[in-house]
């Protein structure tokens, strides 16, 4: 692997922004290092999230309806009788101090933004670090 040099200031800035913003989106063109930067930040912040740092990779998804099951699977949440998958995921996340890294949201931007907003509303200790070639709406962007 090549070394990751020269982005320490960006890493520190993003980590600081995650302390005061529940969603930070890294935007930029393909190949600009968004994913690698997000993973470095997440790795550096593991101690800040006692319930874990989790990665959901959206690249292989073509159907927006698959975002929720993909994220739920990352956390080991399954649909159960009497409750929806979303309810189960929110119940799982509600009291957990967790960082979710959502990688490559750009091709499912609307559905990603809507689900992130729902998760943040229902899980007050959740933080999301997203990567996308396009902004995820009105949330904080880091370019």
Where does each model-flagged region fall?
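Dynamic helix-loop-helix/coil hinge segments at AAA+ ATPase domain boundaries and subdomain interfaces
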Residues: 1-11, 103
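Post-nucleotide-binding-loop coupling segment downstream of the phosphate-binding loop, primarily
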Residues: 9-32, 36-97
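Phenylalanine-focused residue identity feature
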Residues: 4, 71, 75, 139-140
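A short linear-motif detector with a strong N-terminal bias
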Residues: 3-4, 33-37, 78-80, 106-109, ...
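A conserved switch/coupling segment of P-loop NTPase cores
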Residues: 16-19, 42-50, 86-143
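Conserved beta-strand positions that form and line the central face of beta-propeller blades
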Residues: 3-4, 25, 143
């Amino acid at each position: 692997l090549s070394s990751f040099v020269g982005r320490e200031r960006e890493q520190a800035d993003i980590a600081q922004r995650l302390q005061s913003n529940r969603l930070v989106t890294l935007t930029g063109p393909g190949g600009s290092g968004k994913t690698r930067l997000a993973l470095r930040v997440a790795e550096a912040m593991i101690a800040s999230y006692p319930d874990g740092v989790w990665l959901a990779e959206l690249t292989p998804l073509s159907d927006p309806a698959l975002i929720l099951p993909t994220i739920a699977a990352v956390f080991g949440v399954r649909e159960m009788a009497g409750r929806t998958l979303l309810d189960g995921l929110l119940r799982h996340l509600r009291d957990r101090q967790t960082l979710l890294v959502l990688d490559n949201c750009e091709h499912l931007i609307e559905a990603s933004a809507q689900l992130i907003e729902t998760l943040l509303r229902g899980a007050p200790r959740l933080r999301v670090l997203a990567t996308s070639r396009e902004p995820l709406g009105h949330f904080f962007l880091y370019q």
